[in-house]
């Protein structure tokens, strides 16, 4: 993908809330290369974002997104998606792990960017300890390659120590969060269908996954149940 598609800007350095005012489809590619830090009593962990997905909900322009949690109505679960832009939406996925989203669009309009994958840039030992703690006992002693510590949304949330109870609805511009834009625009961005999303929402009609090509931390593409067939868009 060439720079300029999907409204990619040259915003670098520190972010402010206006960065998240556009909808998720505009913001998702701009987050590639940004660095997110999450502090805790154990210490901070930072991750450089290498893969994102956009989800569009109530009040947004464009096609109806059947893959979005906020596609039909506001609920207790998705309430954070309707907050001011620049807040965290953390949910529990498949009864197994947490996933982190950044809230976009003006208040009351629901869109969010799923932070799918990243590369840990500091706090590696703490991220590793958290990942190993979450592993089943039979795998606990097997080493985890550093490039895989935050590969996939569940692993990323675990490495950063995120939970719904502690982090859902928090402001990304206040502790324990800190976020900084990429120091320079990416040389290239790839796009394709979203990973593991069922039905038409996981097909080529919704090429709303964005990633940095050549990054080993990026997920391998896996189609969702009953998703329309498309050429694999695994990271290259």
Please place each PLM-identified region on the residue numbering.
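Conserved, well-structured core segments that form or line functional sites
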Residues: 2-236
């Amino acid at each position: 993908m060439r720079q300029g598609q999907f409204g990619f800007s040259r915003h670098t350095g520190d972010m402010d809330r206006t960065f998240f005012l556009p909808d998720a489809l505009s913001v998702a590619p701009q987050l590639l290369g940004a660095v997110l830090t999450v502090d805790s009593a154990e210490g901070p962990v930072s991750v450089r974002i290498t893969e994102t997905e956009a989800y569009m909900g109530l009040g947004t322009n464009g096609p109806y997104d059947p893959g979005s949690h906020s596609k039909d109505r506001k609920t207790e679960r998705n309430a954070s998606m309707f907050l001011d832009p620049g807040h965290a939406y953390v949910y529990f996925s498949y009864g197994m792990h947490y996933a982190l989203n950044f809230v976009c669009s003006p208040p009351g309009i629901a869109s969010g960017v799923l932070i799918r994958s990243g590369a840990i840039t500091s706090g590696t030992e703490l991220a590793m300890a958290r990942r190993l703690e979450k592993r089943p006992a039979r795998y606990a002693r097997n080493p985890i390659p550093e490039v895989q510590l935050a590969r996939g949304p569940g692993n990323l949330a675990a490495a950063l120590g995120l939970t719904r109870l502690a982090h859902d609805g928090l402001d990304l511009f206040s502790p324990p969060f800190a976020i900084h834009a990429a120091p320079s625009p990416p040389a290239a961005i790839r796009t394709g269908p979203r990973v593991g999303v069922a039905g038409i929402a996981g097909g080529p009609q919704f090429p709303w996954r964005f990633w940095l090509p050549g990054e080993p931390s990026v997920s391998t593409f896996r189609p969702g149940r009953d998703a329309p067939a498309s050429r694999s868009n695994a990271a290259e």
